[in-house]
């Protein structure tokens, strides 16, 4: 049979953390074989990583292996014993190289056996899982054990006195092999909870004892527990502080996790002893057995505990490959039978919370940006300009503060309306709009319901989808060289849209700005240099006093009264608008004659006649001026009228004009409908007045009959003149055509037209005579009249009368 395969396991630190979390939540997983296998596989992977790192550093992989003994259950009490044995190579073995200090992994410890006894046994009703998951509250006992010098180490042996055992404790290093074996018994949670926290736990280190002697020592130690508790209660020195009790409860969970890991390794190693083990560190990492280093103990030092100067941290990638790195700053301690020694530990042990595995929470940070190396002269120049500008602004601010007149702050009513009437009106209008919209929506719904009942729901009709034009029109074939032409077009478009890089533009603008700032003072601004005539400065005090007096003496400002005005009817001409812009020629110089003294002349004395003449001349001149001004005024008035009329004619949108136009259109439409009805009535009357088809046929048949008779008579009458006959035929043809046109207007029979009834007449022409024929013609007329008289309409009677008149005229001609 093939050996059972291990389950597929994700071999990374996250998987290990997940297993430990699951174990804390559900301690019953220790009974699951698959869970134990997964945990051991992860430990093996971490040990392989440790050996890989040792190989990279040049050190050979050590054949050390830490095993855990099985859990022994006594009849009287539940005891959890864990013995760790570390087998090392002999120190005397020669080595070709000298190991560095931080990689010296050779044993430096002696054989120590420390059985730790806890409180009395728990009741038998408790399950094994509760005992296994019990909290080990022994930190207080260890601190009291190693801090109080009055405590003595009780050693028991099969050959020696217990008093001499402690003295010979450190002298066995040369003879016995290096072993560290720790046995401890754990009580349940219920027993510990009821126990006094001040009670101490005795630890008796000893050598290996036979089985029967070890049972005796257990009984002796069980008897010593009450005395120890009483002594600790009486002696105040054994009382521990509340801080130490809080520290022990805080470390209980980590000790529980380590104890569970040890038990799990014990169960799995019984089935697979070839798998190497590793030690769970308090910081959350796993320390393999090949990476532990035991430190030699001396008489002045505390009992043994192992440290790891280099902990291998391992990170697995998604493809299964792993990367390892050393963390040389962390110094953890190996848990030997859950005996955690708090004395003389490193400073990093106090900061273990930093290295415990936690959920990664991203924290914001800023990248370190290198400052740009700028021009020192430009920086100095710009800083000088900035300081100068700040100084000028401060001076201007001080001068503004020292002024006598200051502007009052803008009132709130400039931006916020103080009168609530406008806001109330707006609110009322908004509410009216809302109410009107609701009412309109209600009526729209009702109208839609009525319409849908009468016309059907048009919204339910699905519109047709998009039909491409290629369905009806064949697509245009691809032109030759279409791809090359599109490529060239795209290239031209990209060249047109291309711009220079952002840095070049900013650099150009910055360089122009710095050049202007640096050399702007050197250039002479002609616009700024304006030569003014020197004037004496005004007396500002007098001006201010005058302004204040005027301000005091002024009355309250009167309210604004609106004055009616008219807009400019016509815009200014281009010449008047641009008079200031255009250059004008200089006017010729003329001396003013106003201020010159008037020369005294000998004038003729005015008479009454001259005065009348002058008045008449002045009246004529004024009349001409008034006429001229009147002409100009009338011209502009007429021009404005024409402009207004053309403007209104171009865009007439008044209601009266619209009503007038609609009235005209309605009248025109009525007239056209009346005209159409009249034309239709005339056409109908014409159709009714026209002859029927049977009447036409009978008339044509009679005409053919008469024509044949006439030809027969002409043949019989040879003696008569031919010319007279020809003239008569011409007259008959003219009369026939006129009668055909007047009768039907559209139906014309050719000369060679013959019908079946004409052949019957030919067969009967020998026996027929003129009076009978005339009688037959009258009978046909009577039949036609009788058929038409059956119809009640008068129009048909008139048409029958006209047809009868035509038949009589044709018979008279015959």
UniProtKB/Swiss-Prot annotation:
Residues 606-689 form a coiled coil. InterPro entries: FAM161 (IPR051655). GO terms for biological process: cilium organization. Residues 99-111, 714-727, 751-765 have a biased composition (Basic and acidic residues). Keywords: Cell projection, Cilium, Coiled coil, Cytoplasm, Cytoskeleton. GO terms for cellular component: axoneme; ciliary base; ciliary transition zone. Residues 71-130, 150-255, 569-610, 714-814 are annotated as: Disordered. PANTHER family: PROTEIN FAM-161 (PTHR21501:SF1). This is Protein fam-161.
């Amino acid at each position: 049979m093939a050996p059972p395969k291990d389950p597929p396991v994700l071999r990374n630190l996250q998987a290990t953390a997940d297993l430990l979390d699951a174990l804390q939540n559900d301690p019953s997983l220790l009974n699951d074989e698959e869970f134990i296998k997964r945990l051991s596989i992860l430990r093996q992977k971490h040990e392989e990583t440790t050996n890989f790192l040792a190989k990279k550093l040049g050190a050979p992989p050590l054949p050390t292996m830490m095993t855990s003994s099985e859990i022994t259950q006594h009849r009287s009490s539940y005891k959890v014993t864990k013995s760790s044995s570390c087998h090392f190579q002999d120190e005397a073995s020669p080595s070709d190289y000298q190991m560095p200090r931080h990689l010296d992994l050779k044993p430096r410890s002696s054989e120590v056996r420390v059985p730790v006894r806890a409180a009395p046994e728990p009741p038998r009703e408790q399950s094994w899982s509760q005992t296994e998951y019990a909290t080990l509250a022994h930190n207080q006992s260890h601190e009291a054990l190693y801090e109080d010098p009055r405590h003595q180490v009780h050693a028991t042996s099969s050959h020696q006195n217990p008093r001499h055992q402690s003295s010979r404790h450190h002298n066995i290093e040369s003879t016995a092999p290096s072993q560290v074996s720790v046995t401890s018994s754990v009580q349940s949670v219920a027993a510990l909870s009821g126990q006094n926290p001040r009670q101490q736990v005795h630890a008796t280190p000893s050598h290996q004892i036979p089985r029967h002697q070890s049972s005796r020592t257990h009984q002796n130690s069980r008897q010593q527990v009450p005395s120890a508790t009483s002594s600790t209660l009486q002696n105040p020195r054994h009382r521990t502080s509340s801080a130490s009790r809080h520290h022990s409860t805080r470390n209980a969970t980590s000790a529980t996790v380590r104890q569970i890991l040890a038990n799990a390794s014990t169960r799995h190693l019984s089935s697979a002893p070839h798998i190497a083990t590793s030690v769970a560190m308090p910081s959350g990492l796993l320390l393999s057995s090949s990476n532990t280093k035991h430190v030699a103990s001396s008489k002045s030092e505390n009992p043994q505990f192992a440290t790891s100067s280099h902990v291998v941290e391992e990170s697995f990638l998604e493809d299964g490959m792993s990367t390892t790195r050393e963390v040389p700053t962390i110094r953890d301690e190996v848990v030997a039978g859950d005996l955690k020694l708090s004395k003389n530990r490193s400073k990093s042990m106090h900061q273990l919370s930093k290295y415990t595995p936690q959920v990664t929470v991203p924290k914001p940070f800023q990248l370190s940006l290198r400052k740009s190396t700028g021009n020192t002269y430009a920086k100095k120049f710009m800083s000088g300009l900035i300081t100068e500008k700040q100084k000028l602004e401060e001076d201007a601010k001080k001068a503004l503060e020292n002024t006598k007149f200051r502007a009052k702050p803008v009132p709130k009513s400039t931006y916020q309306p103080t009168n609530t009437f406008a806001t109330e009106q707006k609110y009322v209008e908004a509410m009216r709009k809302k109410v009107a919209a609701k009412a309109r929506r209600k009526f729209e719904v009702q109208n839609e319901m009525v319409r849908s009942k009468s016309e059907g729901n048009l919204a339910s009709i699905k519109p047709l989808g998009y039909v491409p034009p290629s369905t009806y029109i064949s697509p245009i074939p691809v032109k030759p060289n279409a791809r090359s032409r599109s490529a060239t077009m795209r290239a031209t478009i990209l060249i047109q849209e291309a711009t220079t890089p952002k840095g070049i533009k900013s650099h150009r603008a910055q360089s122009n700005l710095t050049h202007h700032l640096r050399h702007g003072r050197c250039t002479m601004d002609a616009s700024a240099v304006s030569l003014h005539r020197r004037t004496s400065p005004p007396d500002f005090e007098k001006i201010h006093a005058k302004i204040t007096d005027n301000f005091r003496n002024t009355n309250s400002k009167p309210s604004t009264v609106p004055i009616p005005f008219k807009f400019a009817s016509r815009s200014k001409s281009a010449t008047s608008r641009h008079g200031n812009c255009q250059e004008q020629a200089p006017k010729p110089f003329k001396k003013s004659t106003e201020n010159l003294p008037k020369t005294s002349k000998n004038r003729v004395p005015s008479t009454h006649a001259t005065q009348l003449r002058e008045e008449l001349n002045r009246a004529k001149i004024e009349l001409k001026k008034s006429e001229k001004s009147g002409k100009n005024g009338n011209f502009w008035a007429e021009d404005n009228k024409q402009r207004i009329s053309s403007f209104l004619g171009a865009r007439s949108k008044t209601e009266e004009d619209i009503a007038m136009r609609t009235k005209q259109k309605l009248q025109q439409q009525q007239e056209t409908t009346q005209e159409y009805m009249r034309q239709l009535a005339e056409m109908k009357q014409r159709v009714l007045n026209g002859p029927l088809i049977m009447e036409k046929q009978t008339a044509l048949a009679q005409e053919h009959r008469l024509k044949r008779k006439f030809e027969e008579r002409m043949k019989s009458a040879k003696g008569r003149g031919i010319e007279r006959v020809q003239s008569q035929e011409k007259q008959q043809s003219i009369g026939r055509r006129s009668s055909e046109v007047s009768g039907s207007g559209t139906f014309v029979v050719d000369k060679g037209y013959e019908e079946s009834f004409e052949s019957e007449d030919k067969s009967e022409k020998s026996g027929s005579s003129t009076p009978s024929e005339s009688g037959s013609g009258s009978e046909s007329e009577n039949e036609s009249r009788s058929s038409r008289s059956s119809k009640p309409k008068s129009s048909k009677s008139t048409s029958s009368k006209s047809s009868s008149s035509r038949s009589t005229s044709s018979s008279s001609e015959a």
